[in-house]
A protein has these predicted regions:
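Catalytic cores of secreted/periplasmic lytic hydrolases that degrade extracellular macromolecules
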Residues: 1-169
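LysM (lysin motif) carbohydrate-binding repeats in extracellular/periplasmic proteins that recognize
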Residues: 172
Length: 172
């Protein structure tokens, strides 16, 4: 739904969620359902949680559900001017989106774009960017997107993603 509404590739959203939250296992994602490491600066009026990241006790956005984190991520990319250039890319061009996110400063890891692309390719998430992507993904990968529990148990080559980036600071 976010891909149709915002034009953000589903594969990018999923890969960022996987990478930033360590497949939903990071302390931040468990404590606050924050699967994208988005900090609570500027005019954030929602719930907050404090977590040591680049500095001690940084403020992060907290969400009532995982779905709310994904919705806020889409709105965050859509409303932050530094990401405007990304929307010139096709929602099926995950490689340009990955490079563009890195260039716009989403993460500090020098290989952030490559890590996103590796996750997308290893997990076949690019299938989600196609028409009827959920059905196509389920038929080709043997997994349903709506039932992600245990998704990566068969992804033995998947690296530990939590080391890939630092949290997203809306002021940078």
């Amino acid at each position: 739904a976010h891909m149709e509404r915002y034009g953000i590739p589903a594969s990018i959203t999923m890969a960022q969620g996987i990478l930033e939250s360590d497949c939903g296992n990071s302390r931040l994602s468990i404590m606050s359902n924050n699967h994208f490491g988005i900090k609570c600066k500027r005019n954030w009026t929602g719930e907050k949680v404090y977590h040591d990241d680049d500095a001690k006790g940084e403020c992060f956005r907290s969400y009532p559900t995982v779905e709310a984190s994904y919705q806020d991520h889409a709105e965050f990319l859509d409303t932050q001017p530094r990401y405007d250039s990304l929307f010139a890319y096709s929602p099926t061009d995950y490689k340009s989106w990955a490079r563009g996110l890195k260039a716009a400063g989403y993460a500090t890891a020098p290989d952030y774009a490559q890590r996103l692309c590796r996750i997308i390719e290893e997990a076949q998430l690019f299938l989600l960017d196609q028409p009827d992507g959920e059905r196509l993904y389920a038929s080709r990968s043997g997994r349903k997107i709506t039932d992600p529990e245990g998704w990566f148990t068969d992804q033995t080559s998947m690296e530990r993603p939590a080391d890939a980036s630092s949290a997203v600071d809306p002021d940078n």
